Amino acid sequence: MFMNRWLFSTNHKDIGTLYLLFGAWAGMVGTGLSLLIRAELGQPGTLIGDDQVYNVLVTAHAFVMIFFMVMPIMIGGFGNWLVPLMIGAPDMAFPRMNNMSFWLLPPSFLLLMASSMIEAGAGTGWTVYPPLAGNLAHAGASVDLTIFSLHLAGVSSILGAINFITTIINMKPPAMTQYQTPLFVWSVLVTAVLLLLSLPVLAAGITMLLTDRNLNTTFFDPAGGGDPILYQHLFWFFGHPEVYILILPGFGMISHIVTYYSGKKEPFGYMGMVWAMVSIGFLGFIVWAHHMFTVGMDVDTRAYFTSATMIIAIPTGVKVFSWLATLHGGNIKWSPALMWALGFIFLFTVGGLTGIVLANSSLDIVLHDTYYVVAHFHYVLSMGAVFAIMGGFVHWFPLFSGYTLNTTWAKIHFMIMFVGVNLTFFPQHFLGLSGMPRRYSDYPDAYTTWNTISSMGSFISLTAVMLMIFIIWEAFTSKREVLAVDLTSTNLEWLNGCPPPYHTFEEPAFVNPKWS
């Protein structure tokens, strides 16, 4: 029974739960790696003593957080749980493929961990640029294992993307049009399209790197007529859509949370929100070289990538102001989930502003590979994606479990986390503007103050993570069951009870078409 339910599952709710648990576990591994990084940088001088090991930590931290925490939780966890419920589908379109998508991740994670256990580990940074990732600078199997790990995670995501696209387009009730689906469903659809189009390019790039390393090809080796810059183009053609893949489901969740706790029955500017997400998805594919302003591109190429990058601020602004307009005049309920959403809107906007700074190629040439870039993307990830995940979790936890969280503890948790992440990452803007480079285990004494403060902030965030574990334990032991849910007519996922039955629909859902 246990094996049939959890190993061979074809149920979107169980698979979603598996994704959430796996993501939470990987998230703690990733947090541990980040704390080791911050411990090393907490004061001048060495702690770990080996710069290769330091770079392995940085590389693993990025891979674990991106591929094994944010994506499994947002797309696999919330996506699997909510998309079928929100469109009235009995399950996903391909339930067994859904199971395989999940079970490809633990082996992938194992390969990534194994890569750091053998030889010297993969100390390449998450970008895995040759020639550093070539077979001279990284002899041994570490980078090869990392590449295989990425292949598995990529196949998992591609299959998941096919599943979500098919489910969302094909499994709505006949009377429901695409423009009647909730914004979270739209966000998962756009995300799935991005995954489907970008991951094959990454697979091509890392496969070429694999053959360069093992089969004497020279795709990225100038000695044989190759070009290492080609790898950067292939990687970032995936890498930039990837960062939008990480944030788009968060946009969808924030739209739901803001609407719900404003007491509104719909978000402000539904169509604008949909097309903003589609625009962001499209533009995300034509700005990749802004990660490469320092490789020596023509001035006209840099002018194009600068302006194209800035255009993304427009649909993003549409979303931010629509969230604020949704809040306007609402009957605001100050729940923990809304606090996460408001924190998301503010801090994501700050991260977006530093992104506008970095979009200027002339400025980026100075700021590239400094802590200013680290501060920028951690504001949009550590305070964008993670705040969206936390907000979504405290909002939908009663749906998933049937139990309610202690709201006082949940609010305290938010406040500790808010202080922690800001104390960690705000000083890094100053470090970057003063020229402190990324991916170094040590630094001149002049940078000590801000690094010490940053490391203190990371330990405050650790306290918040541990408090969250306690809060979840408290909810499951106290067993406060859900009494009533507001606004179910426009929040269909709550309509079948908390938690919903194992099989939501024993017969096709009926949607009255009169409103369309």
Swiss-Prot record:
Reaction catalysis annotation: 4 Fe(II)-[cytochrome c] + O2 + 8 H(+)(in) = 4 Fe(III)-[cytochrome c] + 2 H2O + 4 H(+)(out)
Membrane topology classification: Multi-pass membrane protein
Enzyme Commission designation: 7.1.1.9
Site of covalent link 1'-histidyl-3'-tyrosine (His-Tyr): 240-244
Cofactor note: Binds 2 heme A groups non-covalently per subunit.
UniProt binding sites for O2: 244
InterPro entries: Cyt_c_oxase-like_su1_dom, Cyt_c_oxase-like_su1_sf, Cyt_C_Oxase_1, Cyt_c_Oxase_su1_BS, Cyt_c_oxase_su1_dom
Enzyme class at the top of the EC tree: translocase
Protein localization: Mitochondrion inner membrane
GO cellular component: mitochondrial inner membrane; respiratory chain complex IV
Pathway membership: Energy metabolism; oxidative phosphorylation
Mitochondrial matrix side: 1-11, 87-94, 171-182, 262-269, 328-335, 401-406, 479-516
Keywords: Calcium, Copper, Electron transport, Heme, Iron, Magnesium, Membrane, Metal-binding, Mitochondrion, Mitochondrion inner membrane, Respiratory chain, Sodium, Translocase, Transmembrane, Transmembrane helix, Transport
Claim: Aminoacyl-tRNA synthetase is one of the keywords in the record: no
Role: Component of the cytochrome c oxidase, the last enzyme in the mitochondrial electron transport chain which drives oxidative phosphorylation. The respiratory chain contains 3 multisubunit complexes succinate dehydrogenase (complex II, CII), ubiquinol-cytochrome c oxidoreductase (cytochrome b-c1 complex, complex III, CIII) and cytochrome c oxidase (complex IV, CIV), that cooperate to transfer electrons derived from NADH and succinate to molecular oxygen, creating an electrochemical gradient over the inner membrane that drives transmembrane transport and the ATP synthase.
Record's protein name: Cytochrome c oxidase subunit 1
Organism whose genome encodes this protein: Balaenoptera physalus
